Amino acid sequence: MFAAGLAPFYASNFSLWSAAYCSSAGPGGCSFPLDPAAVKKPSFCIADILHAGVGEPGATPEGLAGASAAALTAHLGSAHPHASFQAAARSPLRPTPVVAPSEVPAGFPQRLSPLSAAYHHHHPQQQQQQQQPQQQQPPPPPRAGALQPPASGSRVVPNPHQSGSAPAPSSKDLKFGIDRILSAEFDPKVKEGNTLRDLTSLLTGGRPAGVHLPGLQPSAGQFFASLDPINEASAILSPLSSNPRNSVQHQFQDTFPGPYAVLTKDTMPQTYKRKRSWSRAVFSNLQRKGLEKRFEIQKYVTKPDRKQLAAMLGLTDAQVKVWFQNRRMKWRHSKEAQAQKDKDKEAGEKPSGGAPAPDGEPEERSPSRSEGEAESESSDPESLDMAPSDTERTEGTERSLHQTTVIKASAAGALLAASSGGSGGSGGGGGGGFNFGGLSSGSTTSAGSSGSHSSGGASELLPAPQPSLSSAPKSPEPVPAPLGGL
């Protein structure tokens, strides 16, 4: 109903009309009574305005019109000195409209409500009617539901602490600000604490601490006054922190990364796990046996055979197809495992079969050597016809030769073979060539025996040494039979 520019004009005219028609001054009087009790209660009824000056002495329609016009012009000129007003020459019921001033004075704030505009124009009127001592008194307290008007001539500076709205949040306080996105708060481990902190800031950030809001209605004031920033926030957030659902929701934090994790985590059901579109088929023992028998016969089934088998066992074609695929995979794996097992078994048997061969050779050779030793031992006393003292003496020298070193024993054996071969060549002939060629213990023994048969005197002094396992190196060649017979 009231525009921004015309609101002060109509509000002031309503108060001036009632004061002008109810005053006790004459037709030319433009002054207002100082006694507020003498002024009638303002009424906006048309009948009261028409019959306002009936009982006044000397009041004429012309004088009434002139008085009201003069009063309007005087008051508007004092209230708005920057604007030019014209006196209303017509009836006071249809006043001439006045154009709103282009420049708004500093003492009058823009876009005020009609109630505050009427109070603003009525307050300077009371200051003009009162004296200087009365102007030093503090202004009356404002009514409940009305805002405190600023003093005339003072610049209105908005105070964020006195306004009902919270101050503008910084970029760090914004939920999706740049500073917060770039920080480490979007880590999944910190998301739960950030959600509770944001909820606390939303509940307690609407009203700063210690701010009185007189302009609010009693219900709204009691509501905001009951919101204690510490007790109420802790009372609201305590069931959230103790809710067992939060522990379940920790496993769904990474399902929706980014800012949507906060929005979807609270609305997500506890059983979020997606159900599979297919269920695992459970076969009976009869069906499993029928499939196994067919698999033993035929690893790959054709489509007609598969349909026939499915009809016989009461299964679907897809179930039989999947079963054969899985069974073939299992068969391949078992086949590969068996082949690897056989390969490892063969590799383990090869070292165990070839190891006893070197140990068996000495056992086979030992009887021949022992037989040769027995022959030499039995032939020496019989052929030489030595006394017991001579045999003991030769055995002692032989033991001393063997006890010194292996090299000396082999050298002594070669020298003995050479000496016995020389004597044998002179007596019997033909034994020396063979004895020089052989260096083994068997050859020396045979040479010694042949030499002893031919010449007994030479062999009595130096008999051939007894062969042993560690005395001389063994030749892999078989020992030939001696040329000289008994």
UniProtKB/Swiss-Prot annotation:
<dbReference type="GO" id="GO:0035265">
    <property type="term" value="P:organ growth"/>
</dbReference>
<dbReference type="InterPro" id="IPR052497">
    <property type="entry name" value="H2.0_Homeobox_TF"/>
</dbReference>
<dbReference type="GO" id="GO:0050679">
    <property type="term" value="P:positive regulation of epithelial cell proliferation"/>
</dbReference>
<dbReference type="GO" id="GO:0048484">
    <property type="term" value="P:enteric nervous system development"/>
</dbReference>
<feature type="compositionally biased region" description="Low complexity">
    <location>
        <begin position="409"/>
        <end position="420"/>
    </location>
</feature>
<dbReference type="InterPro" id="IPR000047">
    <property type="entry name" value="HTH_motif"/>
</dbReference>
<feature type="compositionally biased region" description="Basic and acidic residues">
    <location>
        <begin position="363"/>
        <end position="372"/>
    </location>
</feature>
<dbReference type="GO" id="GO:0000981">
    <property type="term" value="F:DNA-binding transcription factor activity, RNA polymerase II-specific"/>
</dbReference>
<dbReference type="GO" id="GO:0045629">
    <property type="term" value="P:negative regulation of T-helper 2 cell differentiation"/>
</dbReference>
<feature type="compositionally biased region" description="Pro residues">
    <location>
        <begin position="475"/>
        <end position="486"/>
    </location>
</feature>
<keyword id="KW-0805">Transcription regulation</keyword>
<dbReference type="GO" id="GO:0050673">
    <property type="term" value="P:epithelial cell proliferation"/>
</dbReference>
<feature type="DNA-binding region" description="Homeobox">
    <location>
        <begin position="276"/>
        <end position="335"/>
    </location>
</feature>
<dbReference type="Pfam" id="PF00046">
    <property type="entry name" value="Homeodomain"/>
</dbReference>
<feature type="compositionally biased region" description="Low complexity">
    <location>
        <begin position="441"/>
        <end position="474"/>
    </location>
</feature>
<feature type="compositionally biased region" description="Gly residues">
    <location>
        <begin position="421"/>
        <end position="440"/>
    </location>
</feature>
<feature type="compositionally biased region" description="Low complexity">
    <location>
        <begin position="125"/>
        <end position="135"/>
    </location>
</feature>
<feature type="region of interest" description="Disordered">
    <location>
        <begin position="83"/>
        <end position="173"/>
    </location>
</feature>
<feature type="compositionally biased region" description="Basic and acidic residues">
    <location>
        <begin position="390"/>
        <end position="401"/>
    </location>
</feature>
<feature type="compositionally biased region" description="Basic and acidic residues">
    <location>
        <begin position="334"/>
        <end position="349"/>
    </location>
</feature>
<keyword id="KW-0539">Nucleus</keyword>
<dbReference type="GO" id="GO:0046622">
    <property type="term" value="P:positive regulation of organ growth"/>
</dbReference>
<keyword id="KW-0371">Homeobox</keyword>
<dbReference type="GO" id="GO:0001889">
    <property type="term" value="P:liver development"/>
</dbReference>
<keyword id="KW-0221">Differentiation</keyword>
<dbReference type="GO" id="GO:0045627">
    <property type="term" value="P:positive regulation of T-helper 1 cell differentiation"/>
</dbReference>
<keyword id="KW-0804">Transcription</keyword>
<dbReference type="GO" id="GO:0045063">
    <property type="term" value="P:T-helper 1 cell differentiation"/>
</dbReference>
<dbReference type="GO" id="GO:0048557">
    <property type="term" value="P:embryonic digestive tract morphogenesis"/>
</dbReference>
<dbReference type="InterPro" id="IPR009057">
    <property type="entry name" value="Homeodomain-like_sf"/>
</dbReference>
<dbReference type="InterPro" id="IPR020479">
    <property type="entry name" value="HD_metazoa"/>
</dbReference>
<dbReference type="GO" id="GO:0007519">
    <property type="term" value="P:skeletal muscle tissue development"/>
</dbReference>
<dbReference type="InterPro" id="IPR001356">
    <property type="entry name" value="HD"/>
</dbReference>
<feature type="region of interest" description="Disordered">
    <location>
        <begin position="330"/>
        <end position="486"/>
    </location>
</feature>
<protein>
    <recommendedName>
        <fullName>H2.0-like homeobox protein</fullName>
    </recommendedName>
</protein>
<feature type="compositionally biased region" description="Acidic residues">
    <location>
        <begin position="373"/>
        <end position="383"/>
    </location>
</feature>
<dbReference type="GO" id="GO:0005634">
    <property type="term" value="C:nucleus"/>
</dbReference>
<keyword id="KW-0238">DNA-binding</keyword>
<dbReference type="GO" id="GO:0043565">
    <property type="term" value="F:sequence-specific DNA binding"/>
</dbReference>
<dbReference type="GO" id="GO:0045064">
    <property type="term" value="P:T-helper 2 cell differentiation"/>
</dbReference>
<comment type="function">
    <text>Transcription factor required for TBX21/T-bet-dependent maturation of Th1 cells as well as maintenance of Th1-specific gene expression. Involved in embryogenesis and hematopoiesis.</text>
</comment>
<dbReference type="InterPro" id="IPR017970">
    <property type="entry name" value="Homeobox_CS"/>
</dbReference>
